[in-house]
């Protein structure tokens, strides 16, 4: 959930009323927001840097830090927040956004070469904008919040804003080799090629995290004007030539993307929120974007959608009984203009409310406007007896019984390193059905475990100073890649136990296997034709040769049991012999 910081005095001035902290907190709660903290810039810097001296010159102006729902992009800046609150209070009607047409539109042409890096682009113009220091800061902060939120740290969408008066259209969006691109980056004094720019910003506190998005690509995306002046190198940085200042009057906004829908949402959000600062409020100049196939699409769309909802169903879902007119008024206060049409409501969804994608989202806004605290508590109209999920119930029963058998339970991490389930167990990681993390933050958490064994062995290492024997177990899920499932992977509940002593003690884990099967009422298969479990000799690189067996049930391998291989013990820094058993319990549910 993103958090925005707004200066209290500016906020109250825009709202036209002064509130106490408690009163404003109540207003936020009624609107579905939360006042997270009342602080100052000085306190924030002191907290972040842990040094009072570093914040000595910081402002002591009161700042409200407000938690915003992750899908309410229209509330991520002061302008959007104020408009939303004023409409909610009935002090302002929802704005109507309009296009203004000049004799000639600005044009952005997408070159086919961009298909291999960031294939989509959208654009718009805000005319006759008046920036103050506060609105300028808000404009920059909104872009940052959008980049971190819907833009997914610029991987899906990158925003560029430029002083249009310093540029000459039409504009072109191309993809070129890094050394073919040369320009002066924002707030720098010398020109750099694409390759030099990557090296220069590799240690930059804010920008270094975005470099990997395009660094390894043979081409970098770049936007030029008619004079071949570089506007931006998305998603890294804008050019210094067209930077926005307080004197900027006409703003050219471009968004390049790997997701066209997200780009349209971002563009709509920016132009709707900051068209408030145009001389002619809530007006936007559209741009023509020429696609690689020659077709032309006009942006922004600023589409006002309509959704029809049932009054009866809205009341039933929320648990209230209000007339259609009252529900329409509630929705209008939530920035969704609604009109009564028989037993239904026709709801107009403005371009600022891209979070509304289903009738349920509208019902939620009705509930917020009505007030969750005002909904009367009531017992459900029907009775239903709940019961525990069978697999979880079996797990709880086995945990208790295995513990009573003398084993100590361990709860280990679901994520582990590639080496833990691969090299250390004498296995090829590429041959395992493992689910890999796309962007692991540490070497310890690279894949989802496919076996419980590494977690128990690492627990043994952490407790090797304890007296022997050490007998550990865990009953939990592993995750196995499976293309036949909808998400490409499935969970499997397993029990795993390890015995660590001066001797391997295979009979200890074998005895535990027998005890668990006894508890499950599964007999030992002593003759052909009878149903039960048995052991079948096998070889596994994780186990000592000749001392490993498959655990079989109804002719199917459900696990393994054996003495661990010395190289496995050495890889996990263990010096005492160990035996282990691991098998799935799902067939017994």
From Swiss-Prot:
Keywords associated with the record: Aminoacyl-tRNA synthetase, ATP-binding, Cytoplasm, Ligase, Magnesium, Metal-binding, Nucleotide-binding, Protein biosynthesis
Consequence of gene loss (knockout): Lethal.
Catalyzed reactions: tRNA(Phe) + L-phenylalanine + ATP = L-phenylalanyl-tRNA(Phe) + AMP + diphosphate + H(+)
Domain B5 span(s) in chain numbering: 302-377
Compartments in which it is found: Cytoplasm
GO molecular function terms noted in the UniProt entry: aminoacyl-tRNA deacylase activity; ATP binding; magnesium ion binding; phenylalanine-tRNA ligase activity; RNA binding
EC number, as in UniProt: 6.1.1.20
Primary location: cytoplasm
Needed co-factor(s): Mg(2+)
GO CC field: cytoplasm; phenylalanine-tRNA ligase complex
Binding site for Mg(2+): 355, 361, 364-365
SUPFAM superfamilies referenced in this protein's UniProt entry, alphabetically: Class II aaRS and biotin synthetases, PheT/TilS domain, Putative DNA-binding domain
Record-linked Pfam families: B3_4, B5, PhetRS_B1, tRNA_synthFbeta
An individual GO BP term: phenylalanyl-tRNA aminoacylation
Superkingdom classification of source: Eukaryota
Family: Belongs to the phenylalanyl-tRNA synthetase beta subunit family. Type 2 subfamily.
PANTHER family: PHENYLALANINE--TRNA LIGASE BETA SUBUNIT (PTHR10947:SF0), PHENYLALANYL-TRNA SYNTHETASE BETA CHAIN AND LEUCINE-RICH REPEAT-CONTAINING PROTEIN 47 (PTHR10947)
Quaternary context: Tetramer of two alpha and two beta subunits.
Name of this chain's protein: Phenylalanine--tRNA ligase beta subunit
Species in which this protein is naturally found: Drosophila melanogaster
Lineage start: Eukaryota, Metazoa, Ecdysozoa, Arthropoda, Hexapoda
